[in-house]
Amino acid sequence: MVGRGSGLAAWDEAVAEWGSRNATSWSTSVLDRVTDLGGTGYLAVAVTFVASYDLIRHRNPNVVLFLFVVLAGVVLTNNGLKWLVDRERPPVRHLVATSGSSFPSGHSAAAAATSFAIALVVARDWSRRGRAVAAGVAALIAVAVAASRALLGVHWLTDVVAGTAVGWGWFLLSALVFGGRLQRLGDPAARAGAARRGTP
C-alpha cells in the first residue's frame, strides 16, 4: 500500500473529495472527454494513424516500432507496478467507471509517454520553435489527463503524479534506445533534392 499523510500525499484526500463534491454534469462530461485521451483504445488509434502516415512518407519502420514500443511498454510497465503495489482507489464517488488497482494511474502514464512520442515523431522535421510547441502540447495533454483522473475521483493525486512520471520515464528510455535511428530519419524526397543541389 502507498501511504498518505505527508508531502504530496497529504493532498490525496483533499483533491479526491473536492473533485467528487464539486462535480457537475457539465464538468464530469468535459473531464470524461479529457480522460479519454489517455485511454489505451484512443492512443492505439492515434499511434496507428501516425505510424502509418510516417511509414508512407519516410518509408522507415523504425518509427513505427518506436511508437508501438512506447505504447505497449508503458502499458505493461504500469500494469506491473499496479500488480506490485495493489493500492485501493479513493473511497469517494467515482464519476466514471473504473476497475483494478489505483497506483500508478494507467491513463496518466499512457498519455504522458505516448503524447511525447507522437510529438517527437510528428515534429522532428520542424523548426526549433515548432518542436517546442509540439512538446508543450504533449505536456499539456499529459497534465490534463492526469488532472482529470484525480478530479473524477478514480485516482489519488499521488497516483497520477506517479503515472505521469512513469510515462515520461518510459518515453525517455525508449527515445534513448531508438535515438540514433530516429535522428537519421528524414523525408527521402527532401534528402534526394538536397543531394542534387549539392547541399548536406
What are these regions (language model features)?
Residues M1-Y42, W83-L95, T199-P200:
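N-terminal transmembrane-helix/juxtamembrane module of multi-pass inner/ER membrane proteins
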Residues E17, F66-L71, V137, V160-T164:
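Alpha-helical transmembrane segments of multi-pass membrane proteins, especially transporters
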Residues W26-S27, R59-V64, P91, R128-V133:
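Membrane-helix interface segments
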Residues L43-A44, V75-N79, A111:
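Hydrophobic alpha-helical transmembrane segments in multi-pass membrane proteins
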Residues V47-V74:
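Interfacial segments of alpha-helical transmembrane regions
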Residues F49-V50, H94-P200:
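Membrane-embedded catalytic cores of phosphoryl/pyrophosphoryl-handling enzymes
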